[in-house]
Amino acid sequence: MRQIIIAGNWKMNTTLSEACTLVQSMKCELERIEGIEKIICPPFISLYPIKTMLENSSIKLGAQNLFYQEKGAYTGEISPLMLKELCQYVIIGHSERRAYFGETGQVVNQKIKAALQAGLLPIVCVGEKPEENENGQTRQVLETQLKEALDGLNLSCIIIAYEPIWAIGTGKAATASEANSAIGYIRRVLGDTLGNAAAQTSPILYGGSVNEKNITEILSQTNIDGALVGGASLKAESFVSICRQAAVIQNKH
């Protein structure tokens, strides 16, 4: 069984002091949870202080975005080399980046290549809009997004997060069977794009209104290897509960 990954995406939430308080409130409990990969992705400004708080910890850090150039006249951007000193993971291609900042499949592809070049592990997000889901276009959209994102890459493993846009922040998660079916299709596309070996080793996460009440059902599905958690990752008790339930499932195998 692939190792379960639970990643908390804090989005544009928490001041510096709030971020440190949140980490402090769940650090000890999270460190007791074994067998899964635990990742928190705070805003950029909190990465360094949280890194110092998590020194020698089993909790990993991730960024929420990056730019694809190493350095230069790109006002306001953060480069892969800057992030490499602070974290291990980076979220790329989140639907909010695509919607609000115009990120295209080509840009996502450039960012993935830049992250890998710097030694960062990308968490690549894909997912369909509400109208695409209603029109039966989910598979077509996922295939297009994946092939654009992975164009020109020869990888043995890549982390993918399936986040149906209609489920993000709405409280309306995809049913476990819907998520499992979509992720099964993603794995098939990975097989066509990167080869069967990569498809079998690549963890595929589900994201979209994940909470402590639905995580066990989600992770009990055959194709789902973890979760990208939004709002629930901002509550220490909820995030710890999600990780604890994930570890129970992991340790059964």
From Swiss-Prot:
<comment type="pathway">
    <text>Carbohydrate degradation; glycolysis; D-glyceraldehyde 3-phosphate from glycerone phosphate: step 1/1.</text>
</comment>
<comment type="pathway">
    <text>Carbohydrate biosynthesis; gluconeogenesis.</text>
</comment>
<dbReference type="GO" id="GO:0006096">
    <property type="term" value="P:glycolytic process"/>
</dbReference>
<keyword id="KW-0312">Gluconeogenesis</keyword>
<feature type="active site" description="Proton acceptor">
    <location>
        <position position="163"/>
    </location>
</feature>
<feature type="binding site">
    <location>
        <begin position="230"/>
        <end position="231"/>
    </location>
    <ligand>
        <name>substrate</name>
    </ligand>
</feature>
<dbReference type="InterPro" id="IPR022896">
    <property type="entry name" value="TrioseP_Isoase_bac/euk"/>
</dbReference>
<dbReference type="Pfam" id="PF00121">
    <property type="entry name" value="TIM"/>
</dbReference>
<dbReference type="InterPro" id="IPR013785">
    <property type="entry name" value="Aldolase_TIM"/>
</dbReference>
<dbReference type="GO" id="GO:0019563">
    <property type="term" value="P:glycerol catabolic process"/>
</dbReference>
<dbReference type="GO" id="GO:0005829">
    <property type="term" value="C:cytosol"/>
</dbReference>
<keyword id="KW-0413">Isomerase</keyword>
<dbReference type="InterPro" id="IPR020861">
    <property type="entry name" value="Triosephosphate_isomerase_AS"/>
</dbReference>
<keyword id="KW-0324">Glycolysis</keyword>
<comment type="function">
    <text>Involved in the gluconeogenesis. Catalyzes stereospecifically the conversion of dihydroxyacetone phosphate (DHAP) to D-glyceraldehyde-3-phosphate (G3P).</text>
</comment>
<comment type="similarity">
    <text>Belongs to the triosephosphate isomerase family.</text>
</comment>
<feature type="binding site">
    <location>
        <position position="209"/>
    </location>
    <ligand>
        <name>substrate</name>
    </ligand>
</feature>
<feature type="active site" description="Electrophile">
    <location>
        <position position="94"/>
    </location>
</feature>
<feature type="binding site">
    <location>
        <begin position="9"/>
        <end position="11"/>
    </location>
    <ligand>
        <name>substrate</name>
    </ligand>
</feature>
<keyword id="KW-0963">Cytoplasm</keyword>
<dbReference type="GO" id="GO:0006094">
    <property type="term" value="P:gluconeogenesis"/>
</dbReference>
<protein>
    <recommendedName>
        <fullName>Triosephosphate isomerase</fullName>
        <ecNumber>5.3.1.1</ecNumber>
    </recommendedName>
</protein>
<dbReference type="InterPro" id="IPR035990">
    <property type="entry name" value="TIM_sf"/>
</dbReference>
<feature type="binding site">
    <location>
        <position position="169"/>
    </location>
    <ligand>
        <name>substrate</name>
    </ligand>
</feature>
<dbReference type="InterPro" id="IPR000652">
    <property type="entry name" value="Triosephosphate_isomerase"/>
</dbReference>
<comment type="subunit">
    <text>Homodimer.</text>
</comment>
<dbReference type="GO" id="GO:0046166">
    <property type="term" value="P:glyceraldehyde-3-phosphate biosynthetic process"/>
</dbReference>
<dbReference type="GO" id="GO:0004807">
    <property type="term" value="F:triose-phosphate isomerase activity"/>
</dbReference>
